[in-house]
Amino acid sequence: MNAALDDKAAKKAAFEGNKLAKRLRHHVGDAINDFNMIEEGDRVMVCLSGGKDSYTLLDILRGLQKSAPINFSIVAVNLDQKQPGFPEHVLPEYLKSIGVEYRIVEEDTYSIVKRLVPEGKTTCSLCSRLRRGILYRVADELGATKIALGHHRDDILHTLFLNMFYGGKMKAMPPKLVSDDGRHMVIRPLAYCREKDIIRYADWKAFPIIPCNLCGSQPNLQRQVVKEMVNDWDKRFPGRVESMFRALQNVVPSHLADPKLFDFVGLQTGDAPFADGDTAFDKEEFRDPAPDADDVEDAPKKRTISILDSRGKESGCGA
């Protein structure tokens, strides 16, 4: 009896895990296609920290690599910043076991950060800048044409609210960007993926997670407050987070207040219809949006399947 129950539970777990993997693959494939993140012949450097996000990113990209209509290579890179207690053996052992090309870069940024940042203050900002410079250098050494980071949809929304609340800017975290010096292309293939899906996926795959608090830095309190706020909205108003993310993809500059984005000064009347006109007076149909279809359907939406299955071989990456 117990054996039968265990077998049934195992089959159910496998079914749910495969469904989750399929959803994440479609979300990643969608983002890659929508933003032209990966092209024929690209060498993608996946930045691997040892956390759930970067493990998931590497795993999903390797799966897409096998079925994509284009050819691209992957090299995983981990920056060992010499934090006390960092388990140096974990990532090399894992990467060898899955047979992926990798490089471990050893740079003692931990000592630099501890020397420059007062005790008790968050070190994340300086640490991030130092890490970014090193990764750009390594990308050059490896001949990488794309640098893939593990930021997901929730990270993008959190950054939007942080900039609004504390920086006075309508600015989020782009799915694709060029570095300040114009020489490196950074991509975020998990841009459409929900953190809660990534957490479940990492647990299902049993990745050897390395804790992110080894440096002893205090967490970014502002980011934590924003994260808790968004998570609360997600629980109380299902579908609202999806709606907020869609807003980032449906910007109407003529109905904001930035004269750098829209020529309010030069606005003139005329006889011809004006596309950016009085839509502000359209009937309001505000309501709580429906939850993400992923929560109520087993399969991805037809739109997603169409994008992944019908694009030409010369473009993008499919599942």
UniProtKB/Swiss-Prot annotation:
Entry GO MF terms: 4 iron, 4 sulfur cluster binding; ATP binding; magnesium ion binding; sulfurtransferase activity; tRNA binding
Basic and acidic residues: compositionally biased ranges: 280-290, 310-319
Cofactor: how and how many bound: Binds 1 [4Fe-4S] cluster per subunit. The cluster is chelated by three Cys residues, the fourth Fe has a free coordination site that may bind a sulfur atom transferred from the persulfide of IscS.
Biochemical pathway: tRNA modification
Pfam families the UniProt entry points to: ATP_bind_3
Coarse class of the protein's main subcellular location: cytoplasm
Positions of region (Disordered): 276-319
Subcellular location: Cytoplasm
Motif PP-loop motif boundaries: 49-54
GO aspect biological process, one term: tRNA thio-modification
Cofactor annotation: Mg(2+); [4Fe-4S] cluster
Top-level EC class as recorded in UniProt: transferase
Reaction catalyzed: cytidine(32) in tRNA + S-sulfanyl-L-cysteinyl-[cysteine desulfurase] + AH2 + ATP = 2-thiocytidine(32) in tRNA + L-cysteinyl-[cysteine desulfurase] + A + AMP + diphosphate + H(+)
Positions annotated to bind [4Fe-4S] cluster: 124, 127, 215
Described purpose of this protein according to its UniProt entry: Catalyzes the ATP-dependent 2-thiolation of cytidine in position 32 of tRNA, to form 2-thiocytidine (s(2)C32). The sulfur atoms are provided by the cysteine/cysteine desulfurase (IscS) system.
Protein name as catalogued: tRNA-cytidine(32) 2-sulfurtransferase
The encoding gene: ttcA
